[in-house]
């Protein structure tokens, strides 16, 4: 639960991050004796580089220092500020979180996996990940064919809140790549044709 101080810090950080084209995704304040800690995760449509994170950190730090001087906030005798990106384990919640990860494979709530194809209003189009069938062992490795799933599923975004991005070490299967880049209306048509 956010405290009044957390809310003030988030508002200050969001104003400064916006100057760099960044959104504040998460803020954690920890009071630890003489040295407190403020950790802020920021993101943008294009992944921020280290220079942009440094610029945001300087702006946010200056805003915090000015607010402390004006006695609007109290971070304790000293504090450490860490500005970073959310990371792959950050749970997707907002439309912008899903939008920034179109084309990436996600671990969905309930245990499924699917590729984020499109986001519009409060809907997300998901291309279900192909499931591997068991196959013969070949040269010490398990061989298997991927069984295609339904071409697309449309979910209310709220049902997918908490999804996380999965690390992939190879490109998406060709069948999934071919289905990326359609409009939400086209994904709705695909979903309807699959139901028939």
UniProtKB/Swiss-Prot annotation:
Q: Which InterPro entries match?
A: Ribosome_maturation_RimP (IPR003728), RimP_N (IPR028989), RimP_N_sf (IPR035956)
**Domain of life of the native organism:** Bacteria
Instruction: Enumerate the UniProt keywords alphabetically.
Output: Cytoplasm, Ribosome biogenesis
Q: Where in the cell is it found?
A: Cytoplasm
Q: Which SUPFAM superfamilies match?
A: YhbC-like, N-terminal domain (SSF75420)
- Any matching Pfam family: RimP_N
- Principal localization reads cytoplasm
Question: What segments bear the compositional bias annotation Basic residues?
Answer: 131-145
Positions of region (Disordered): 131-153
**GO BP:** ribosomal small subunit assembly; translation
Q: Name one GO cellular component term.
A: cytosol
Q: HAMAP family, from UniProt?
A: RimP (MF_01077)
NCBIfam families linked to this entry: PRK00092.2-2 (NF000930)
What job does this protein perform? Required for maturation of 30S ribosomal subunits.
**Family from the record:** Belongs to the RimP family.
Q: What is this protein called?
A: Ribosome maturation factor RimP
What lineage is this protein's organism placed in?
Bacteria, Bacillati, Actinomycetota, Actinomycetes, Mycobacteriales
């Amino acid at each position: 639960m956010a405290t009044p101080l957390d809310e003030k810090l988030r508002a200050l950080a969001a104003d400064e991050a916006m100057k760099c084209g960044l959104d504040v995704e998460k803020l954690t304040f920890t009071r630890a004796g003489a040295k407190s800690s403020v950790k802020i995760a920021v993101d943008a449509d294009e992944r921020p580089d280290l220079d942009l994170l440094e610029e945001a950190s300087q702006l946010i730090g200056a805003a915090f220092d000015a607010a402390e001087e004006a006695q609007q906030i109290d971070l304790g005798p000293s504090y450490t500020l860490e500005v970073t990106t959310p990371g792959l384990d950050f749970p997707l919640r907002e439309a912008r979180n899903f939008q920034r990860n179109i084309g990436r494979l996600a671990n969905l709530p309930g245990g499924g996996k699917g590729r984020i194809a499109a986001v519009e209003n409060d809907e997300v189009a998901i291309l279900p990940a192909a499931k591997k069938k068991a196959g013969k062992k070949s040269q010490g490795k398990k061989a298997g064919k991927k069984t295609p799933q339904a071409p697309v599923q449309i979910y209310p975004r709220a049902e997918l809140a908490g999804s996380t991005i999965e690390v992939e070490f190879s490109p998406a299967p060709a069948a999934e790549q071919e289905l990326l880049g359609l409009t939400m209306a086209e994904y709705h048509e695909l979903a309807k044709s699959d139901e028939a």
